[in-house]
């Protein structure tokens, strides 16, 4: 490669202020790198008025406005869709905004929505808000209902949510049974697939219409980006979500897209590392006398394990522990706060381990929670497994005697 870059062409002298705004900067051709360029834009420049006036919002072959798409965001959308096994993806500012995109695209006043009782709590709060203020009926169902879903369907049911597994209590639903019933009746199904990151569960192979993910988690991997995605294999569903996204004004920054793109090449390696450590630590905790139950999809006694074994090719870094009922909430809180290598905080999917206690009985409305002990969800990060196990053991010994 030559070091002789082409010189800027000579032209009429212009004021420096104008030159700063309208530079002529030839670039040496042939540059390539592993990174997708970061294209920041609000205004998108059109070559002529005819091109501007010919815009069709349904077309993905035309650039419109930086809020809607840039080369950087499109590159990320394409990669997310490919990993998931879909054809179309839309990026949202957060996982919750991706959930909102589905609601706004497919539900209106007078419609009925079914949501699993183990759903991600912001989705529950979103549904309750829509029910209270927008005239939509939202009902919660037992996540293990399977083909029993048929008895719950109404003529105005428009949307069924699924979560596989439940991100706190780890039940794995019979996804194909539910999606088959929905498809027979023209009901849209949307599944929160954040747990699998599109790696170990392929929703479109099991009849799901729309997959929703929080790219905040495994895709980013750094605990420093907020982003979500809606993915589908159906063009009409894609256009409905695209239209709703544009009307609400949802968009993502090119810089955030670049950060997520940077995390994708290592995602599967990280995912498997989380999985190995989580399985080992969950198995060890299962043998501890302080523990009444370990909720991990790979364990035979986890609700829906047979469906996980049939439909999944792995597990992530999440699992939950139900402590023996003899321990009070205060004691379990002290155990969690006594952990040195586990942070307290929302979200997961990054390099650092996290532990959070939950009052599941207070969160359920569709049925009775079968356990009496306090539940703690563990997210196993990339710290060495032996150090994490030693940290848990120290806090167990100190606080749960």
Across the structure, where does each feature detected by a protein language model lie?
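N-terminal "arm"/small-domain region of PLP-dependent enzymes with the aminotransferase-like
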Residues: 2-70, 78, 376
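Short, solvent-exposed beta-strand edge segments and adjacent coil->beta transition regions
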Residues: 60, 225-227, 314-318, 373-377
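Short, well-ordered beta-strand elements within core beta-sheets of diverse protein domains
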Residues: 260-269, 316-325, 377-381
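Conserved small-domain helix->loop->beta segment predominantly found in fold-type I
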Residues: 279-340, 344-349, 360-370
């Amino acid at each position: 490669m030559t070091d002789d870059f082409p010189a800027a062409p000579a032209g009429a002298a212009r004021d420096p202020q104008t030159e700063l705004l309208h530079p002529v900067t030839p670039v040496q051709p042939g540059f390539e790198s592993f990174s997708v360029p970061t294209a920041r834009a609000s205004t998108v420049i059109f070559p002529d008025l005819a091109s501007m006036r010919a815009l069709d919002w349904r077309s993905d072959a035309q650039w419109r406005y930086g809020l809607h798409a840039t080369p950087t965001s499109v590159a990320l959308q394409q990669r997310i869709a490919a990993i998931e096994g879909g054809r179309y993806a839309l990026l949202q500012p957060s996982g919750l905004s991706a959930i909102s995109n589905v609601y706004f695209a497919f539900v209106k006043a007078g419609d009925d929505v079914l949501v699993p009782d183990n759903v991600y709590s912001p989705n529950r709060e979103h549904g309750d808000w829509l029910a209270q203020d927008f005239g939509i009926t939202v009902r919660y169902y037992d996540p293990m209902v399977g083909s029993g879903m048929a008895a719950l369907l109404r003529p105005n049911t428009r949307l069924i949510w699924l979560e596989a597994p439940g991100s706190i209590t780890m039940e794995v639903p019979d996804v194909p049974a539910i999606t088959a019933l929905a498809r027979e009746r023209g009901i849209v199904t949307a599944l929160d697939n954040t747990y699998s990151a599109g790696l170990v569960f392929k929703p479109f192979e099991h009849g799901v219409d729309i997959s929703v993910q929080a790219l905040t988690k495994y895709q980013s991997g750094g605990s420093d980006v907020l982003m979500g995605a809606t993915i589908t294999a159906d063009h009409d569903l894609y256009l409905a979500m695209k239209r709703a996204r544009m009307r609400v004004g949802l968009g993502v920054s090119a810089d955030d897209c670049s950060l997520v793109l940077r995390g994708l090449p290592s995602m599967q390696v990280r995912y498997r590392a989380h999985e190995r450590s989580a399985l080992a630590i969950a198995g060890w905790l299962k043998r501890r006398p302080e523990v009444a139950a370990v909720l991990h999809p790979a364990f035979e006694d986890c609700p829906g394990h047979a469906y996980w074994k049939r439909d999944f090719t792995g597990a992530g870094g999440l699992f939950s522990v139900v402590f023996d009922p003899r321990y009070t909430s205060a004691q379990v809180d002290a155990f969690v706060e006594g952990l040195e290598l586990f942070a307290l905080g929302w979200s997961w999917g990054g390099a650092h381990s996290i532990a959070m206690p939950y009052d599941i009985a207070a969160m359920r409305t569709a049925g009775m929670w079968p356990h009496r002990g306090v539940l703690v969800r563990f997210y196993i990060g990339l710290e060495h497994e032996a150090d994490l196990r030693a940290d848990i053991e120290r806090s167990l010994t100190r606080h749960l005697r």
